[in-house]
Structure formats: C-alpha cells, structure tokens
Amino acid sequence: MANSSPVYDWFQERLEIQDIADDVTSKYVPPHVNIFYCLGGITLVCFLIQFATGFAMTFYYKPTVTEAYNSVSYLMTDVSFGWLIRSVHRWSASMMVLMLILHVFRVYLTGGFKRPRELTWVTGVVMAVITVAFGVTGYSLPWDQVGYWAVKIVSGVPAAIPVVGDFMVELLRGGESVGQTTLTRFYSLHTFVLPWTLAIFMLMHFLMIRKQGISGPL
C-alpha cells in the first residue's frame, strides 16, 4: 500500500493484514442477489443488539423470585434510559424472529438448502430453534404473572414424552415445582448457554457461506 504508516507496516509484516482485508472486501457477489439476501445479515444485527442491551440489563437485574420483578421495575423507572434499553431489547427480539422467519422462507424458496449447502441449512435450523428458546427463557425473567405461568406451561410440555418426559420436566424446573431453581436455570440459559451456543453456530454458518458462496438463482 502506498504511503502506508509505520504502524500499518509493522502489522502487515507480521500478520499480512492486507491479504485478509482483500479477501474480505473482494468476494464475488452474484448479479441475482437482491435485498432479500440481506435478511440473514439483519438477523445478525438484531442478535448483536440483543447481546449489547441484554448485557447492559444484567447490571441491574436480580435473578431471584423475590427481587426479579422489582429489579425490572427499577430498571424501567429509575435507571437513566433503562426503559429505552429494555424496550430496544424487546423490539430487536421481535425483529430478530421476524427476520429469521423471512430468511428461512427466502432460502427455501430459492433452493439455498440444496446440495452442497445441506449443512448450512442444518446449522440455520439449529439457530432457529435456539432463537425460539431465547424467547421462552427471556419471557420468564421478569417473573410476573405472565412469565411465571408461561414457564409453568412450557416446562410441563415435555411430560407428554414417554419414558424421559418426567425427567426432562424436572431437569427444566430444577425440581418438581416451578420456583427459584427454575428461574436460575432459565436465567443461565438465556444469558450464557444460549448466546454462546448461537454464536458458535453462527460462526459455522458464516464460514460455510463464505466457503461455498451464495446459491445461484432458480
């Protein structure tokens, strides 16, 4: 690069950052690609917003059955811009689900799931399931009447599964009934297990797209 700085030269000599930049910026984009091919990227942006706003809320949220509701109320009424942070979190959650659904339809209608992109489709389906799990676990965290009964109903659904149903219910609830252990498990899932699992599958998803390229037109 002409007129490069000493700092740039130092990194270029060791990491060859220009080659990386050229690879990222010079990828061929097929002429049939339109705005509907951006739905996956918009879903990623929504996830990043979720991550940032969710991280901000962890400074104030208290995952106990006695303090969860009051901590959310405090965030909404007393914390500067707390209402905005939580509202953006909720809006981006809805937007993420909507963009995910539209993205799945686009991929299906354009045949993006066909050979050799079957694994890309599989990772996408897994991420869709994780996104739904995000909604279920996040819905319970305010621990109000809606959240409590939602958890009770959802965690009781596996009881209909033969043999392992009762075990799965107890695993989700942390006991025979819904209580503090249930809230703790849902909080851990929502703030740690699910985000990192989704991030791993996103990385796999993007690497496969990067390797195989965008599918052709029908």
UniProtKB/Swiss-Prot annotation:
Heme 1 (or BH or b566) is high-potential and absorbs at about 566 nm, and heme 2 (or BL or b562) is low-potential and absorbs at about 562 nm. The keyword Amino-acid biosynthesis does not apply. Keywords: Electron transport, Heme, Iron, Membrane, Metal-binding, Photosynthesis, Thylakoid, Transmembrane, Transmembrane helix, Transport. It is a multi-pass membrane protein. Signal peptide: none annotated. This is Cytochrome b6. Binds 2 heme b groups non-covalently with two histidine residues as axial ligands. Binds one heme group covalently by a single cysteine link with no axial amino acid ligand. This heme was named heme ci. Component of the cytochrome b6-f complex, which mediates electron transfer between photosystem II (PSII) and photosystem I (PSI), cyclic electron flow around PSI, and state transitions. The keyword Transmembrane helix applies. GO terms for cellular component: plasma membrane-derived thylakoid membrane. Heme b 2 binds at H89, H190. One of its GO terms (molecular function) is metal ion binding. The chain crosses the membrane at residues 35-55, 93-113, 119-139, 189-209. Heme b 1 binds at H103, H205. The 4 large subunits of the cytochrome b6-f complex are cytochrome b6, subunit IV (17 kDa polypeptide, PetD), cytochrome f and the Rieske protein, while the 4 small subunits are PetG, PetL, PetM and PetN. The complex functions as a dimer. One of its GO terms (biological process) is photosynthesis. InterPro entries: Cyt_b/b6_N, Cyt_B6_PetB, Cytb/b6-like_sf, Cytochrome_b_N_euk/bac, Di-haem_cyt_TM. Heme c binds at C38. Belongs to the cytochrome b family. PetB subfamily. Its cofactor is heme b; heme c. It is found in: Cellular thylakoid membrane.
